[in-house]
Amino acid sequence: MDLLNKTILITGASDGIGEVLAVEFSKLGSNIVLLGRDPSKLDKVYDRLDHSFGSQKHLILQADLSLLSNESAHEILIAITEEFNCLDGIIHNAAILGTMTTLEYYELSKWDEVLNINLRAPFLLTKTLKSILEDSSLPRIIFTSS
């Protein structure tokens, strides 16, 4: 698949697998939308992205997926539409394990955070971005886990 000028949204792009994916896809000529919680980490990843292709652009979007709402997902749609007017792929990479403890000590608030980041946010982002994603000739959605 030719990734030149394809626009790819990567969640959890501030480090780890998300950072590597962003850097490697940019080397293939993709426009990268970096989505993560930590603006300073996102800035560092942005600085590592390849900008050598003429029309290549990248975008940083800061969001805490544990708190993602319909409104904030819609703001992400607007930002991507204004910058690129297209979206060819989403890589749902953001995930957390939560507290490593026995059930009796596991706090409900931590469980809610795990569910929000790992399940609710990918669902809500995909649902919200579906309209712009469907305009792509070959849209892709990838879910990762580690």
Feature annotation, model-predicted:
Residues 126-127:
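A short, exposed helix-loop element centered on a Lys and neighboring polar residues
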Residues 53-69:
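Rossmann-fold cofactor-recognition segment
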Residues 76, 101-103, 110-115:
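Substrate-binding pocket helix/loop in short-chain dehydrogenase/reductase
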Residues 14-15:
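Conserved glycine-rich cofactor-binding loop
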Residues 6, 86-88, 133-146:
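Active-site loop of short-chain dehydrogenase/reductase
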Residues 93-99:
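Conserved NAD(P)H cofactor-binding loop of Rossmann-fold oxidoreductase domains
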Residues 30-45:
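Conserved glycine-rich Rossmann-like NAD(P)H-binding loop of the short-chain dehydrogenase/reductase
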